[in-house]
């Protein structure tokens, strides 16, 4: 039996998201395990493959997939700690200027002002908007896969409060504005590459906009439990990591200041040549 046959037989019945299964297949192919005999697979063999990955964050994700696929525990395939990416985030005005030039402006605004992931933003329809006690909420209960072939559950379910202007834009959507099944959600990410502000060379992507949403709350001292709810994080540790996301300006502010001490003359210098 080959690994791909094992995967198709054992994983197909597990209650995993469509996108998760796609990512698992990508992982097995990237690690060159897909066409190998299943009998050749051992924790040590898999770990050696994972160790060959340079990107620490990808290494951590793939280690998790391998544990899941082959039912290994953490003593067999250790947990790999990722390295948080540090963004020097543009201002809201700079981001809006770029977003307004995109055909996917609504999806990008949902990432920026509702903290949605790109697949969740693409799947948004007016029925998800509800008003409660004078405020608008978006029920995040669906997402489209990267390849556009599946509408399913999002990575994390939840209800988030959104600004009125954004709620009204969603409520104003027509049927022809809805994301069509078969259109890959990764098109939004790909389109961002051509949106750089040629004056200041600002680049955006949906994940960076979601990160801006979280960081903006942290800088306004929004309580951690509120950030956790708005971001739909599964645990408080993930939400706390938002506070660890600092840019170079924050680091400069953290540097200690060396005091300036006036030097004292220890003795009077006498010119003997005059």
Over which residues does each language-model region extend?
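Catalytic-site neighborhood detector that most strongly recognizes the C-terminal catalytic loop/helix
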Residues: 13, 231-256
């Amino acid at each position: 039996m080959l690994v791909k046959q094992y995967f198709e037989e054992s994983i197909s019945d597990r209650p995993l998201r469509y996108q998760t299964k796609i990512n698992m297949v990508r992982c097995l192919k990237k690690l060159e395990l897909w066409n190998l005999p299943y009998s050749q697979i051992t924790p040590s063999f898999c770990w050696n493959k994972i160790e060959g990955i340079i990107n620490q964050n990808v290494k951590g994700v793939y280690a998790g997939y391998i544990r899941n696929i082959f039912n290994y525990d953490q003593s067999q395939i250790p947990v790999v700690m990722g390295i948080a990416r540090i963004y020097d985030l543009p201002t809201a005005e700079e981001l809006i200027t770029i977003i307004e030039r995109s055909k996917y402006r609504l999806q990008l605004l949902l990432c920026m002002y509702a903290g949605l992931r790109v697949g969740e933003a693409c799947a948004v329809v007016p029925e998800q908007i509800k008003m409660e006690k004078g405020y608008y909420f978006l029920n995040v209960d669906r997402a489209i896969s990267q390849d556009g072939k599946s509408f399913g559950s999002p990575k994390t379910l939840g209800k988030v409060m959104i600004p009125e202007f954004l709620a009204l834009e969603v409520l104003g959507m027509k049927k022809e504005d809805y994301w069509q099944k078969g259109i890959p959600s990764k098109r939004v990410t790909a389109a961002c590459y051509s949106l750089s502000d040629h004056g200041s060379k600002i680049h955006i992507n949906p994940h960076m906009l979601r990160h801006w949403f979280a960081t903006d709350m942290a800088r306004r001292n929004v309580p951690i439990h509120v950030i956790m709810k708005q971001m739909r994080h599964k645990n408080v540790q993930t939400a706390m990591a938002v506070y660890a996301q600092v840019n170079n300006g924050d680091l400069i502010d953290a540097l200690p200041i060396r005091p300036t001490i006036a030097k004292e003359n220890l003795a009077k210098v006498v010119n003997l040549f005059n």
